[in-house]
Amino acid sequence: MGNQAGNNNETRDLLVGIDAGTSVIKAVAFDLSGRQIAVASVPNRYTTSADGAATQSLDQTWTDCAQTLRDLGAKVDGLAQRTRALAVTGQGDGTWLVGAGNKPAGDAWLWLDARAANTVRGLQEGPASRARFEATGTGLAACNQSAQIAHMAATMPDLLARAEVALHCKDWLYLNLTGVRATDPSEASFTYGNFRTRRYDDAVIEALGLSAQRRLLPEIIDGTQITHPLSADAATATGLLAGTPVCLGFVDIVLTALGAGIHTEGAAGASCSIVGSTGMHMRAMRNEDVHLNAEGTGYVIALPVPGMSAQVQSNMAATLNVDWVLNLATDLLKQFGTTLSHGERIKCIDGWLQSGRPGSLLYHPYISDAGERGPFVDPNARADFIGLTSESRYPDLFRAVVEGLGMAARDCYTSMGIPMPDELRLTGGATRSRALRGVLGAVVGAPTRISTREEAGAAGAAMMAAVALGVYPDMDACIAEWVTPLLGQAEAPDAELTQLYAQLFPAYRKAREALVPTWDETARLLKSRYRPNALSAGLN
């Protein structure tokens, strides 16, 4: 067989999922039933600057991806010969321009890049803005590739002139793996198309002022139906066999949700929240049942299930708030010559949550310099405590911060215009704390459930490959084996706390609406002082 993939599926018992995130690039091996075998990772690298730029080297990203696959091969005996398929997903939004010879036209603009903010304001004021939102289901922000290309067209026409195709992160890796320029239905439709058809929409492209740039948009392929073979060059770079089928996954946010249980049989009322640096709150919906809010915020992202999408609202900062309040304690202790390791701080979380007084304070978790993006968009929004007294102590502050994360999640789910979750499936590092899960469940008013799945994004990508290769007849059959058995027991929220938080939520909502003029005035007062441009909202 040499360095070519053969057709003996009896020995090809593994699927490999790649998740190229903003923080880490991972390659994960799974057996065909979904059991995780091994994982390899390298830190992702990008640069930021005071003008709001956040950029990443395309060549370095491919080098790092190939390195994770070689490292995975060092951990798994016979990985190359055993790999039945490779699947790739990655960070969403952003712009990865490729020119002649499939070489980078420049560094990638990430979802973090804020330079298109003024262009977004102009597009939002256009007469076709609402029609664009109703087609894509997605609020326009500086993170979106469409906004970034519109900004480039106005300010950097030479860059676009060098480009032959505009890709996303996973698409760039797929190009390097297969030599095929393509994107997936999820990012194509929420950026330039219609989530109902999963195709490009010329009216949307025209509303964005990008008809002249239509040439940059690649072919759309559905990775549950189409794969391409690993190229000889990619085989040399990764240590895998040329000809191995490669699957282009959907964007990592919905594949993470898929692996964590957003869509399982008999659980139509369940929702999924990813509690990471940001908060992603979503419900799997039939396309005809999606509700588009009057504010024009959020995302509607196609799922790799026919006729289904994830209706998404995302708040800018989730565990960033917890990091901030933990750092308050750490910094104070340093003044007295005491240090706390990250692990020691994490061990304190449950104790502080238990000793803090429930509902004694209100906290709005807008700790990011970029303000808030969901369920409302305001770059001037800032965090605050309401209700401080001389009796307030650090555990009260800490508990209020976690309650604030729950309030933000409830705010997001309320704004979707659909029934509140009857079960909340949680993923993200912070949800390992049972006490924290208890607070989130009580604030949202739903039982919580977590999965033992460690690498949900890579698993979601591998699941797409499993369906594409016929290991399973459809995604529902794959979910039944890869996802459902890994879900833990439902944890019911405390009834008394649920009632308390239900009474407090209207005050939380009214307070954040009343604070808008204060945020604006504060921003004006600070304008004369040097502050780096805040980073833009987007999918990470």
Residue map of PLM features:
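A conserved helix-loop-beta module that forms one wall/lid of the active-site cleft
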Residues: 209-221
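Short beta-strand-loop/turn "lid" adjacent to the catalytic site in phosphate-handling enzymes
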Residues: 76-111, 139-143, 174-194, 219-224
